Amino acid sequence: AVGDDTPQLY
């Protein structure tokens, strides 16, 4: 999710 420390799609 947005703001998480791991790279991921919005």
Curated annotation (Swiss-Prot):
Q: Does the keyword Oxidoreductase apply?
A: yes
One example of the protein's molecular function in GO is: hydroquinone:oxygen oxidoreductase activity
The pH dependence is: Optimum pH is 2.2. Activity declines sharply with decreases or increases in pH and is absent above pH 6.6.
Instruction: Explain how this protein's activity depends on temperature.
Output: Optimum temperature is 40 degrees Celsius. Retains 65% activity at 20 degrees Celsius and 24% activity at 100 degrees Celsius.
Q: How is the cofactor bound?
A: Binds 4 Cu cations per monomer.
Q: Which GO terms describe its cellular component?
A: extracellular region
The coenzyme or cofactor needed here is: Cu cation
What are the protein's UniProt keywords?
Copper, Lignin degradation, Metal-binding, Oxidoreductase, Secreted
Activity-regulation annotation: Strongly activated by Mg(2+) and Al(3+). At concentrations <50 mM, activated by Ca(2+), Mn(2+), Co(2+) and K(+). Strongly inhibited by Hg(2+) and, in a concentration-dependent manner, by Fe(2+).
EC class, as a word, reads oxidoreductase
Report the domain of life of the source organism: Eukaryota
Q: Does the keyword Secreted apply?
A: yes
- What GO biological process term is on the record, naming one? lignin catabolic process
Q: What is this enzyme's catalytic activity, as reactions?
A: 4 hydroquinone + O2 = 4 benzosemiquinone + 2 H2O
Q: Can you say where in the cell this protein is located?
A: Secreted
Q: What does this protein do?
A: Lignin degradation and detoxification of lignin-derived products. Has activity towards ABTS and, to a much lesser extent, towards N,N-dimethyl-1,4-phenylenediamine, catechol and 2-methylcatechol.
Q: Which family does it belong to?
A: Belongs to the multicopper oxidase family.
Other information: Inhibits HIV-1 reverse transcriptase (IC(50)=0.6 uM).
Question: What is the name listed in the Swiss-Prot or TrEMBL entry for this protein?
Answer: Laccase
Give the organism, scientific name. Hericium coralloides (Coral tooth fungus)
